[in-house]
Design a protein with these regions (language model features):
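Non-transmembrane, aqueous-exposed alpha-helical and coiled segments at domain scale
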Residues: 1-395, 403, 419
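N-terminal low-complexity segments that are often proline-rich with Ser/Thr-Pro
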Residues: 394-427
Length: 428
């Protein structure tokens, strides 16, 4: 049960079980943790690629750039280069898995510090996975820094709870990409790209904004009434799988209390607890089986630990990479696996005749919207000597340069011609 894993296991131990099907023994766990730690550093070329991004780049965009850059670093294990059978080797599969798990926290640390303008601390391979992640965020140049054990434990359990949750949008994207034979970095990057979407990975941030809008417990009855009247949306409740209480939500609520004991109580936790209490006592929500899910309390935990809301999805992507890799490995070893090709039901027009362009009228159904250039683009085009500028039809006209007017071409170019003649005569 997930409650037992959260209490007794660790993220990496549970990750081993996800990938290989069973919990490891002591020697297997030690080798697994060491292999992941050995692959935690990023190639310098990937670091340079990240450093070339804008300082205000979204952390998930930085994660995607890093993963895609890693795709170019190991051509000898890329099916498109080394041959389609390269992943038939379990040893090759396993090496790619530990590479990505090891590098996810390092990529995340670089994504975090892209906004701060500082470089993260180098990975500390003597620390646990979650402890090393916090170390890279906070140590700076102080290699004696040690994250607080309670915060490291909270981070580890949060990773464990988010590692995998059956088939979903991003996991399906990973398996879909893997079926074409792409390298594993592209498959995981595609999945992380799907997670970037606010309908998938941004639910805990939406919960936080909802609680902030409610403000205090006195406003909860009015909010719940608005939800029933379709005036408000209640985030963090309900799940496609769990029709009763999401067990992960109970665990995260306990983690929240542990974190608050250390860093101080977030006043929004009282709003969250009372909202949960009133919703669970309301027949409207009970009848619809709307109970708190994993996202309801996780944003409060992340905020209490000092993470900005735009970083929440990165904290989701780090552990979920293990789930993606488990599905990737499973699909590779499935003898019946073929390239995925979903069927589509076409509902458009059937056979039509080709109409010459001079006889066509403007489409009345669907057409490209007018794309207005920026003022900077208009400035550049105003100095462009080309004849046709379709964007200048909106009240803007370009004066014709003298050298384009036809009657003054000779005059306009005579100075250039004379200069060329003099240079040739002088041997230049």
């Amino acid at each position: 049960p997930i409650e037992t894993l959260a209490e007794s296991s660790t993220y990496l131990e549970s990750a081993f079980a996800l990938v290989y099907g069973d919990l490891p023994n002591a020697s297997q766990l030690m080798e697994w943790e060491r292999a992941i730690a050995r692959h935690s550093a990023l190639p310098v070329q990937v670091v340079h690629a990240i450093e070339a991004l804008p300082h205000d780049a979204h952390p998930m965009a930085v994660m995607l750039a890093g993963l895609n850059s890693l795709s170019s670093m190991h051509p000898e294990q890329n099916p498109a280069i080394a041959g389609g059978g390269i992943y038939n080797s379990h040893a090759v599969q396993d090496k790619q898995i530990v590479r990505i798990i090891g590098k996810m926290t390092t990529l995340a640390a670089h994504a975090y510090h892209r906004n701060t303008g500082r470089a993260p601390a180098a990975p500390n391979t003597r620390m646990s996975y979650a402890e090393n992640f916090l170390y890279m965020l906070d140590a700076g140049l102080d290699n004696r820094h040690r994250p607080h054990p309670k915060l490291a434990k909270a981070m580890d359990v949060m990773f464990l709870l988010h590692a995998e949750h059956e088939m979903n949008c991003s996991t399906a994207a990973c398996r879909h990409l893997a079926s074409s034979g792409v390298d594993v970095f592209c498959a995981v990057a595609g999945a992380v790209g799907a997670l970037y979407g606010p309908l998938h990975g941004g639910a805990n941030e939406a919960v936080l904004k909802m609680l902030e809008r409610i403000g205090n417990v006195e406003n909860i009855p009015n909010f719940l009434a608005g939800v029933k009247e379709k005036r408000y949306v209640m985030f963090g409740f309900g799940h496609r799988v769990y029709k009763n209480f999401d067990p992960r939500a109970k665990i995260i609520r306990k983690i929240a209390n542990d974190v608050f004991e250390l860093v101080g109580r977030d006043p929004l936790i009282d709003v969250a607890i009372e909202l949960e209490k009133q919703a669970r006592a309301d027949e409207y929500f009970v009848k619809r089986k709307l109970y708190p899910n994993v996202d309801f309390y996780s944003g409060l935990v992340y905020r209490a630990m000092g993470f900005p809301p735009e970083f929440f999805t990165v904290l989701f992507a780090i552990p979920r990479a293990t789930g993606y890799l488990s599905h990737w490995r499973e699909s590779l070893n499935d003898p019946d696996q073929k390239i995925m090709r979903p069927q589509q039901v076409y509902q458009g027009e059937w056979l039509r005749d080709y109409v010459p362009i001079t006889s066509r009228s403007r489409s009345l159904t669907d057409a490209m919207e007018d794309i207005q250039p920026s003022n900077a683009a208009r400035r550049r085009m105003a100095g462009d000597p080309s004849d046709a500028h379709p964007w200048f039809g909106n009240g803007m006209e370009m004066s014709t340069p003298a050298w384009q007017s036809g009657t003054t071409v000779g005059d306009a170019t005579s100075g250039v011609e004379n200069c060329l003649v003099k240079n040739v005569a002088a041997g230049k």
